[in-house]
From Swiss-Prot:
Keywords: Nucleus, Ubl conjugation pathway
Family statement drawn from the similarity comment of this UniProt entry: Belongs to the SKP1 family.
Pfam families per record: Skp1, Skp1_POZ
Zinc recorded as keyword: no
Subcellular location: Nucleus
Signal peptide limits: none
Record-given protein name: SKP1-like protein 14
Species the sequence originates in: Arabidopsis thaliana
Function statement: Involved in ubiquitination and subsequent proteasomal degradation of target proteins. Together with CUL1, RBX1 and a F-box protein, it forms a SCF E3 ubiquitin ligase complex. The functional specificity of this complex depends on the type of F-box protein. In the SCF complex, it serves as an adapter that links the F-box protein to CUL1.
GO cellular component, one term: nucleus
SMART domains hit by this protein: Skp1 (SM00512)
Designated gene of the protein: ASK14
Length: 149
């Protein structure tokens, strides 16, 4: 494993110096390294410093690809620290940076948080306006009564 350092720079100018092995967890960076496009610094224009610091923490923990109960427990506790807007930003960053494990974890966290919520509660979480008339909503509920049981 290489001990080279790479600086990851966020959209708001924060820099994070990490081991190459950690940087390679970001597949977008790994492809740059493999294509000899990375010298020492990688600008990540779609990720803020706040979110990049969380991504770096996750990648440092997961630098060794290992599936175990310890990782699962750590992942669950890790995600509990973040509010919904932060989880959404992590989801977007994980997608942009191509970090499958973090993408899956973020998506599962969102799914777990909306599980057993009413449509109104889900609309509030996602800031979605209800554009159904009361009549249309009643028709949809009647048509899909099994889903509301």
């Amino acid at each position: 494993m290489s001990s080279n350092k790479i600086v990851l720079s966020s959209s708001d100018g924060e820099s994070f110096e990490v081991e190459e092995a950690v940087a390679r967890k970001l597949k977008i960076v790994e492809h740059m390294i493999e294509d000899d496009c990375v010298v020492t610094e990688v600008p990540l224009q779609n990720v803020t410093g706040k979110i990049l610091s969380i991504v770096v923490e996750y990648c440092k923990k997961h630098v060794v690809d290992e599936e175990s109960d310890e990782f699962k427990t750590w992942d669950e506790e890790f995600m509990k620290k973040f509010d919904q807007p932060t989880v959404f930003q992590l989801l977007l960053a994980a997608n942009y940076l191509n970090i499958k494990g973090l993408l899956d974890l973020s998506a599962q966290t969102v799914a777990d948080r909306i599980k057993d919520k009413t449509p109104e509660e889900i609309r509030e979480i996602f800031n979605i306006e209800n554009d159904f008339t009361p009549e249309e909503e009643a028709a949809v509920r009647k048509e899909n009564a099994w889903a509301f049981e």
